[in-house]
Amino acid sequence: MSNSISILLRRNLDVFGENDPARRRAVIDEIFTEDCVFYDPNNGIYRGRDEIDRIAGAIKATRPDFQYQPIVEPDVSGDGGRIQWVSGRPGEAPAYAGTDFIVAREGRIAAVYLFFDKLP
Protein backbone atom coordinates (compact mmCIF):
# COMPACT_ATOMS: atom_id res chain seq x y z
CA MET A 1 0.00 0.00 0.00
CA SER A 2 1.30 3.45 -0.88
CA ASN A 3 0.52 6.41 1.35
CA SER A 4 1.19 10.11 0.91
CA ILE A 5 3.78 11.69 3.19
CA SER A 6 1.06 13.75 4.91
CA ILE A 7 -0.97 10.63 5.66
CA LEU A 8 2.10 8.80 6.97
CA LEU A 9 2.89 11.69 9.31
CA ARG A 10 -0.63 11.68 10.74
CA ARG A 11 -0.85 7.89 10.99
CA ASN A 12 2.46 7.82 12.88
CA LEU A 13 0.80 9.98 15.55
CA ASP A 14 -2.01 7.41 15.66
CA VAL A 15 0.53 4.66 16.43
CA PHE A 16 1.75 6.44 19.55
CA GLY A 17 -1.76 7.40 20.64
CA GLU A 18 -3.33 3.95 20.22
CA ASN A 19 -4.23 2.02 23.39
CA ASP A 20 -5.22 -1.23 21.68
CA PRO A 21 -2.06 -3.30 20.97
CA ALA A 22 -3.61 -5.17 18.03
CA ARG A 23 -4.78 -1.97 16.32
CA ARG A 24 -1.42 -0.30 17.00
CA ARG A 25 0.44 -3.24 15.44
CA ALA A 26 -1.86 -3.28 12.41
CA VAL A 27 -1.06 0.38 11.71
CA ILE A 28 2.66 -0.24 12.24
CA ASP A 29 2.60 -3.11 9.74
CA GLU A 30 0.72 -0.92 7.26
CA ILE A 31 2.78 2.28 7.38
CA PHE A 32 6.35 1.24 8.33
CA THR A 33 8.91 -0.58 6.20
CA GLU A 34 10.21 -3.83 7.69
CA ASP A 35 13.63 -2.25 8.27
CA CYS A 36 12.32 1.07 9.64
CA VAL A 37 14.27 3.05 12.22
CA PHE A 38 12.94 5.32 14.98
CA TYR A 39 15.38 7.85 16.45
CA ASP A 40 14.33 8.94 19.96
CA PRO A 41 16.58 11.63 21.47
CA ASN A 42 15.91 10.41 25.02
CA ASN A 43 15.86 6.65 24.65
CA GLY A 44 17.96 5.71 21.65
CA ILE A 45 17.41 4.03 18.31
CA TYR A 46 14.77 1.41 17.59
CA ARG A 47 15.05 -0.78 14.51
CA GLY A 48 12.27 -2.72 12.84
CA ARG A 49 8.54 -2.95 13.35
CA ASP A 50 8.81 -5.09 16.50
CA GLU A 51 10.97 -2.53 18.30
CA ILE A 52 8.77 0.37 17.21
CA ASP A 53 5.75 -1.56 18.47
CA ARG A 54 7.52 -2.22 21.77
CA ILE A 55 8.55 1.40 22.39
CA ALA A 56 5.16 2.78 21.29
CA GLY A 57 3.48 0.39 23.74
CA ALA A 58 5.89 1.32 26.53
CA ILE A 59 5.31 5.04 25.98
CA LYS A 60 1.55 4.53 25.88
CA ALA A 61 1.66 2.46 29.09
CA THR A 62 3.18 5.40 30.97
CA ARG A 63 0.56 7.83 29.61
CA PRO A 64 -2.49 5.74 28.68
CA ASP A 65 -4.87 8.69 28.40
CA PHE A 66 -2.58 10.96 26.36
CA GLN A 67 -3.39 11.71 22.73
CA TYR A 68 -1.22 13.29 20.04
CA GLN A 69 -2.62 16.20 18.05
CA PRO A 70 -0.99 18.00 15.13
CA ILE A 71 -0.74 21.75 15.66
CA VAL A 72 0.05 22.67 12.04
CA GLU A 73 -0.42 21.03 8.68
CA PRO A 74 2.39 18.66 7.71
CA ASP A 75 5.30 20.02 5.66
CA VAL A 76 6.36 17.75 2.80
CA SER A 77 9.50 17.81 0.67
CA GLY A 78 10.28 14.97 -1.71
CA ASP A 79 10.27 11.68 0.17
CA GLY A 80 10.25 13.36 3.57
CA GLY A 81 8.18 15.52 5.79
CA ARG A 82 7.59 16.85 9.27
CA ILE A 83 4.69 17.41 11.59
CA GLN A 84 4.55 19.42 14.81
CA TRP A 85 2.32 18.05 17.54
CA VAL A 86 1.31 18.32 21.18
CA SER A 87 0.35 15.57 23.57
CA GLY A 88 -1.67 15.41 26.74
CA ARG A 89 -4.97 14.41 28.24
CA PRO A 90 -7.99 15.41 26.16
CA GLY A 91 -9.55 18.62 27.48
CA GLU A 92 -6.39 19.67 29.36
CA ALA A 93 -3.39 21.79 28.43
CA PRO A 94 -0.74 19.82 26.51
CA ALA A 95 1.97 18.20 28.63
CA TYR A 96 4.66 18.21 25.95
CA ALA A 97 5.28 18.96 22.29
CA GLY A 98 7.43 17.65 19.50
CA THR A 99 8.20 17.43 15.83
CA ASP A 100 8.45 14.21 13.86
CA PHE A 101 10.54 14.11 10.70
CA ILE A 102 10.04 11.10 8.46
CA VAL A 103 11.74 9.65 5.42
CA ALA A 104 9.51 7.44 3.29
CA ARG A 105 10.32 4.65 0.89
CA GLU A 106 7.75 3.07 -1.42
CA GLY A 107 4.84 4.67 0.43
CA ARG A 108 5.93 3.61 3.93
CA ILE A 109 7.94 5.19 6.72
CA ALA A 110 11.59 4.12 6.58
CA ALA A 111 12.82 6.46 9.32
CA VAL A 112 11.33 8.70 12.01
CA TYR A 113 13.37 11.38 13.76
CA LEU A 114 11.71 12.64 16.95
CA PHE A 115 12.51 16.08 18.36
CA PHE A 116 10.96 17.44 21.54
CA ASP A 117 9.89 21.09 21.36
CA LYS A 118 8.92 23.78 23.82
CA LEU A 119 5.20 23.95 24.38
CA PRO A 120 3.52 26.48 22.09
Placement of each model-derived feature along the sequence:
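A beta-strand edge to alpha-helix "cap/lid" segment located at domain peripheries
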Residues: 4, 53, 59-120
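Short charge-dense sequence patches
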Residues: 1-11, 48-52, 109
